[in-house]
Curated annotation (Swiss-Prot):
Keywords carried by this UniProt record: Amidation, Cleavage on pair of basic residues, Hormone, Secreted, Signal
GO cellular component: extracellular region
Biological process annotations from GO: response to light stimulus
Record GO terms (molecular function): hormone activity
Residue numbers of Alanine amide PTMs: A86
Keyword Secreted: yes
Database matches in InterPro entries: Pigment_DH
The protein's name: Pigment-dispersing hormone peptides
A Pfam family hit: Pigment_DH
Primary residence: secreted
Length: 89
């Protein structure tokens, strides 16, 4: 083989190696950017969902005043007695 053929093969191998390395680095950088933007999309998606829920329920009356858990439990436990008393009358 001549020196020209060897240097041509080396040059081809060098160019191909550089291309593959550049391609690998580009793919890695693109994937990092996608992950970064995807985290922001999740954050903004939650904010948008919260805002839409507030907008949808804006004109509805409040469900109830904030009760403590014990008040809710006591009212639920007293419900059968109240129904039983109402049936006797």
């Amino acid at each position: 083989m001549t020196a020209m053929a060897v240097s041509g093969k080396l040059l081809t191998a060098l160019v191909l190696s550089t291309y593959i390395l550049g391609l690998a680095l580009t793919i890695q950088a693109t994937q990092y950017e996608e992950d970064k933007y995807q985290e922001n999309e999740v954050k903004y998606g939650r904010e948008l969902a919260s805002w839409l829920a507030q907008l949808a329920h804006k004109n509805e009356p409040a469900i109830c005043a904030h009760k403590r858990n014990s008040e809710i439990i006591n009212s639920l436990l007293g419900l059968p007695k109240l129904l039983n008393d109402a049936g006797r009358k």
